[in-house]
Amino acid sequence: MSPVPLRFICLTALLAAVRAPAQDHDDFEDPPISYSATKPDDVVTRLNAEFAAQAEEIRGWPARRRVRCVLETLEVPAESQLLVFTTTSLQRTLISPENPRALFFSDEAYVGWVPGGGIEITVFDPKLGATFYLVDAQESPPKPLFNRSSECLLCHKRHERTPSLRTRSVYPDRNGEPLVGSGGSNIEPSTPYRERWGGWYVTGAPGTLRHRGNVKGEKAEDFDGDQGLSSALVPDLKEIVETRRYPLGTSDVVALLMHDHQVHVHNVISTANQQSRVALHRWPAMRAVLGLPKDAAPAGSCLAQLNSQAERLIDALLLKDEAPFPEGGIKGDGVFESVYAKTRKADCKGRSLRDLDLGTRLFKYRCSPLIYSKSFGWLPKELRDLTLSRLSEGLKAPQPPAAFAHLPAEERKAIHEILTETLADLPTGWKR
């Protein structure tokens, strides 16, 4: 075996020292991210400037009017409403089965609200990823309308220790408190539907769909046994919740499916964004030690990190690990589906990535519409170009790689054609 050059040993030792933070230290607080020390450049920061003169007036509005204002301003549809009755939130003391927390979402923002409490907002920053804010009616000038919240990070940094979204399924008791010692789990793409939505209200779901939603109990068997799962159907939330306090009286199952999908993809995008920025930040020092020219393309561990994140992005975008739908499919009340389709981008054949299937899977063409999102567009150019080039290669390959094997040839062809026509700024490596 040939000897290892001294410069590689020195470089490895240097990087090891740089990457050895204290056990409770978050890497995203260091350059180039510097999460807490950096002022976000997101939509909420700009809205604070616009609403500065109205902040006190808006705080005095009735709660539902404030919620409507936030939703309309952030272009988040009220029809996306979900209701969570478990006390797993910053405002846990206000939440109960009779007073659930409402969640709303779009491709670019997430909004949470509990009657009697503040409005929680998550949006995305080009460098920081997920950023968290609170609109509190009790605040007074000179506080801005939207206040950045560091408390959210106590729970919202669980996805590879980056600021992220979180969707949990737990075993709630009659008061919405998670049962002691019962555990719970994050909802991932592969999570079976029988294990999802513990602590959530689920409306519009077919009787064939077994899940943990709508159920309160005293032991795990109350949720997972046939009796518990079969009692999960709720014909009308008005029997439990004073629904007139909320924009809608539903927590639609299709909106839940979409929320699960988007939370996962947004988390993968945010992690890829931060990890690749860190790798690219370290690349000049590595390049200098290796004696490479300034225009040298990323190599070594930097390239390995970019390759790894590109693979994860492709897996998430193509719904590689999607749990199988129950026989007969999943149908909701149709309200969310109609609103979701309004922003579809169609190709010349009328096909769109926002077309839903709901028979055997979520999307008719299994490539996430979040590929059009600002978050994906904000990825470092090196990573975005690499991801899209790999995506086009896999979609066009006669013998597709493993990440594409779940997609039939006709579906791969359709996805490629849709993206070629509808996705802006395709890289030179995109195969046409």
Which ranges hold each PLM region?
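Surface-exposed patches in mature extracellular/periplasmic domains of secreted proteins
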Residues: 78-86, 323-331, 399-410, 427-431
